[in-house]
């Protein structure tokens, strides 16, 4: 077993499974998808650690792969079916989008940094994926042209209510992400039911805030 293969197994055994991830589809996906290919060469030694790993290289916004256990638990909570259409908002280099593609019927990913969106496309081709596409777009804007979606995954945190994304959920659709407007920050699931949006806390979590979903500064005079 290669060094990265061993690290991948250890990530699943020591981070993912102990975090109550019992969906074997997600476990199998995390064992199969090489997380290191989504990380710059200089950062690859960090790829499988319990860290938010920075993948941006000089762009206007710092971008990260969020902690493995956090994305695994959010995907499990979303209960993605093989017929579902999924939007991954703020995909960085595409790791969460690839995991989702192993669960869903169709995946669209958005990324604000064009160079990272291009990197994600390269990795998708490298891995032979045909059911996932990426667009260079603000995570907060979503993908209204192809909405509605069964599932929306925030590949990071939000400090504001992502109303535009709520509006892109199908009836019965689910949005999962880290909501940093609560203290402590928590992963949440929001469900669209009969025109209403109900939320439920999943677990305490932290993640870097996605571009466009930052809290607006308040000026006091």
Name every feature range the model reports, one short phrase each.
Residues 1-87, 95-99, 103, 116-126, ...:
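Class I SAM-dependent transferase core
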Residues 79-198:
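Conserved nucleotide-cofactor-binding alpha/beta core module
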């Amino acid at each position: 077993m290669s060094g990265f293969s061993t690290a991948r197994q250890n990530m699943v055994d020591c981070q993912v499974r102990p975090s109550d991830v019992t969906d074997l589809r997600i476990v199998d996906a995390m064992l199969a998808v090489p997380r290191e290919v989504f990380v710059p060469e200089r950062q690859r030694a960090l790829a499988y650690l319990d860290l938010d790993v920075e993948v941006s290289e000089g762009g206007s916004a710092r971008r990260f792969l969020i902690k493995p256990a956090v994305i695994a638990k959010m995907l499990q909570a979303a209960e993605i079916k093989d017929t579902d259409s999924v939007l991954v908002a703020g995909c960085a280099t595409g790791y969460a989008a690839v995991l989702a593609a192993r669960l869903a019927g169709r995946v669209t990913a958005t990324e604000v940094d064009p160079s990272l969106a291009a990197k994600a496309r390269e990795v998708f081709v490298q891995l032979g994926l045909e059911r996932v596409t990426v667009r260079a777009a603000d995570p907060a804007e979503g993908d209204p042209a192809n909405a509605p979606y069964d599932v929306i995954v925030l590949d990071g945190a939000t400090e504001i209510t992502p109303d535009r994304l709520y509006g892109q959920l199908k009836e019965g659709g689910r949005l999962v992400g880290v909501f940093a407007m609560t203290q402590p920050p928590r992963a949440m699931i929001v469900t669209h039911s009969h025109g209403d949006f109900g939320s439920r806390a999943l677990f305490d979590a932290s993640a870097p805030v996605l571009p466009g979903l930052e809290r607006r500064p308040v000026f006091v005079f």
